[in-house]
Amino acid sequence: MEIINNKKVAVSTSEELKNALENDNGYEFIYLMDNITLDSGIKINENKEKVVIDGTYNGNRYTLTGMSSTDAVDTIVAVSTNKEIIVRNINISYENTYGVIYVPLDLNYIGLLTVYDNINFNGTRLAYNPYGNVKIIDSNIVIEETNGIASLEICVGNYVIIGGKTTITSSSTNSCLFYFRNNLTPSIVFLCQSDVSLSTNTREFMTGTNKLNFTILHDTKVHIITANGLGPNPVYGTNNVLIDERATLIFIQKSHQRVPVWSTYGNFTMKKDSNLELINSYENTPADNYNIHFKGSNCKFILDNPNSVVMYSKNASVLYTNNTLEYKIKCKRINLWNNSKTLTSAGDINDLPEYSWYKDDDLLEINGNIDATTTTITSHNLTEEELNKLPDLNNFIFQSKKQFSLGNNIINVHPIDNSKNKISGHTTDMADVLIKYNNTIEIVKADDDGYFEYNITDAITDNTKIELTSNVASSFIYGSRTITSPYDGELSLIDAVKTFTFSKVPISLDPMIFGKNESISLKIVDSRVNSSEWKVYAYIKNPLTSQGGYTLKNALVFKKLDNEVVILNESPTLIFTGTNNDGNAKMTLITWSKEKGPLLDLTNSALEANEEYF
């Protein structure tokens, strides 16, 4: 044992680890300085409110191996006076099914936090903390049979937090990924700006509750693959679901059982620019294996301007409720299909939705109610002119729909008249573009800049209606434009970065300026016949503010390409001027490096500790 100071110690044997944790010695940080295999259970001293077990010492990372036992007392055991137990920077091999830290099934342990940070774990179960909180950060977790001991869940917990770059896989045939008890209010939260992947090819996501609050915080991607969906029987499900701004959930069911892919008893809410893919990829799924079954009596389905939503099933309705479900949809475009192709050929340019509704220059808003047999619309913002060219709203029916999507592909159509020998434009990179006019139907491919063209032999006469539809294969997302020749082109923002983060390392000390972690770009296409200068402005709706209400005034600045620096506020500020296109359609890619564009100026402000600003 190497004593570092009165709070830190390094250990090299199981006995030394036991002494450091069990005795009232003041040690809060215990470092491994060798690989250790436990040869007895350890009960953490009651006077240690917080303890950290760190597997890295002097630049070397070590492995903790558990005992060959499945008894709760043969692991590291918490007591009720412990508050926070952190295991970090370590490799772990464990066969004990009570996890690395065993927290007893006792209401006295409510709120006890066990943290697994930057660990590589192979074993039967990572965490057992049924009434407490479990946090998993920046880790690789493999749940598998170990030394003949069958594997169970990743963890048993009440409030589970997952974040950072975390990958979790399970080959357990006995247990779901998570177990939550139903006598509290269980939750799972995916932290902001995280990238999390979870998979089981044999079981479901969770079991034990129909009250799970499921939250993905902003700018986070969560990819979940299961054999049989959310839960193993029709009772288990979520309470409220939140997919926050710019967050993404991909949830795939590969097999089936006679329960919905996802059952929910509360509200299902998606915020601005969020994304959802809810896919049942099993082709022979039964008709009652709905993608989402809203089971609560007061559920709401709130889609508040998400970037994209895709739900797919070969045979079952993607949405079902046997109660009255209120829906509120704000989006760029809605697509509904009566029938479904096989997944490998669905959602492409040859699988156009039977029904699509959208507005050309605004967001579509449509609200109403759904029950087991009827979809009703209580309000919408489509004009009479728009309704005349779109499907009848009597076809806006969720019942028996096998495919459903929200989202839009932008299309900039270049000028067309009787002197042109092509139809061209810009859209999403590598999209397929369906072009229809008169008796002509053609599909062309956009290049990696989004440019497409179709060469024609006969001139297009005036007053010809031309329909264009853009789709990236298998995306289920479409964009549509209908124009009449002659057409004089347009100015379009094709693509823009939606989020970025600031570096923690300043690029200037006086003033104290922080750059971005990566460059940002705008893609603008000007195809106007009568082109002129165009301008890009920047402004902020509110100053940077933390969850706790702390504000950074005048902290957001913009460094233009000519190095002029301006403070951003509620008033739009000119940041770029584009030139006219000289008579030819032109794409302009504006890129601001890490050291230009939006920057963070903390010369006259200070960040509060443990606060996130947005």
Label every PLM stretch briefly.
Residues 1-19, 274, 278, 296-299, ...:
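Extracellular/surface-exposed low-complexity segments
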Residues 9-12, 23-39, 50-58:
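Glycine-rich repeat segments that build the extracellular carbohydrate-interaction surface of secreted
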Residues 28, 429-433, 464, 520, ...:
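Short beta-strand/loop motifs in extracellular/secreted proteins, especially
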Residues 37-53, 63-89, 93-110:
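Extracellular beta-strand-rich solenoid/capping regions of secreted or surface-exposed proteins
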Residues 40-42, 67-70, 95-103, 121-131, ...:
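Short glycine/acidic-rich loop motifs that flank beta-strands on beta-rich extracellular proteins
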Residues 52-55, 82-89, 107-117, 134-138, ...:
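All-beta strand scaffolds that present successive hydrophobic residues in beta-strands
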Residues 405-486:
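Ser/Thr-rich low-complexity repeats and stalk/linker segments
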Residues 486-614:
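Signature of Gram-negative chaperone-usher
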